[in-house]
């Protein structure tokens, strides 16, 4: 269950039955405020060593991609502020339960399949996103499932440098081009 409260894995809870969902609401009904909106998302078994894939797009083109090993965590924000290499991120909720798993790991993914990139391009085009991320995973039964469309980017410079780019410079250049084009 994911509440309508932004990212950083905020208040996500794993449930496996309707009884568990009802128990979450009974235990803490205020967690879903102010709008009582939540998303019930299927948990998809996948190889934890492969993790998930996040592709960052800029102007409809792939900027770079990364593999993310979650270690069972839900805060997958790639910003070094949220998920530094030492695991002491600034985006954890103060009331969150302590997590005893290793920190989330981010690796450059230079061999992202062409088909995945093309689907990602179609998604960002359909969503009319100039800058954004798309996440997918490959299930244990071989399906590639795109499950998150991120309408902004939290760039991870260490991953982008493996692609030979500075992501911040690319975004600034893109925005300058947009401003110049709009001024004409």
Label each region the model flagged:
Residues 1-11:
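A conserved helix-loop-beta module that forms one wall/lid of the active-site cleft
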Residues 6, 60, 139-142:
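Short strand-connecting beta-turns/loops that link adjacent beta-strands
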Residues 10-124:
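Phosphate-binding site of ATP-dependent enzymes
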Residues 49, 130-131:
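Residues that act as N-cap/strand-start positions at coil-to-secondary-structure junctions
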Residues 134-136:
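Hydrophobic residue at the +6 position relative to the catalytic HRD Asp in the kinase catalytic loop
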């Amino acid at each position: 269950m994911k509440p309508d409260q932004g990212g950083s894995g905020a208040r996500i809870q794993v449930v496996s039955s309707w009884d568990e969902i009802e128990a979450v609401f009974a235990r803490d009904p205020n967690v879903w405020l102010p709008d009582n909106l939540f998303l019930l998302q299927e948990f998809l078994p996948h190889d934890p060593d492969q993790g998930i894939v996040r592709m960052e797009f800029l102007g409809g083109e792939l900027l770079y991609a990364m593999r993310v090993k979650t270690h069972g965590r839900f805060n997958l924000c790639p910003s070094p502020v949220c998920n530094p290499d030492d695991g002491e991120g600034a985006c954890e909720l103060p009331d969150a339960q302590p997590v005893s798993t290793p920190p989330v790991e981010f690796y450059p993914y230079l061999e992202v399949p062409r088909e995945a990139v093309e689907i990602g391009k179609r998604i960002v085009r359909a969503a009319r996103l100039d800058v954004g991320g798309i996440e997918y995973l490959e299930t244990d039964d071989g399906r590639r499932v795109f499950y998150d469309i991120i309408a902004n980017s939290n760039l991870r410079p260490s991953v982008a440098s493996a692609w030979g780019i500075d992501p911040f410079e690319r975004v600034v250049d893109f925005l300058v081009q947009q401003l110049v084009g709009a001024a004409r």
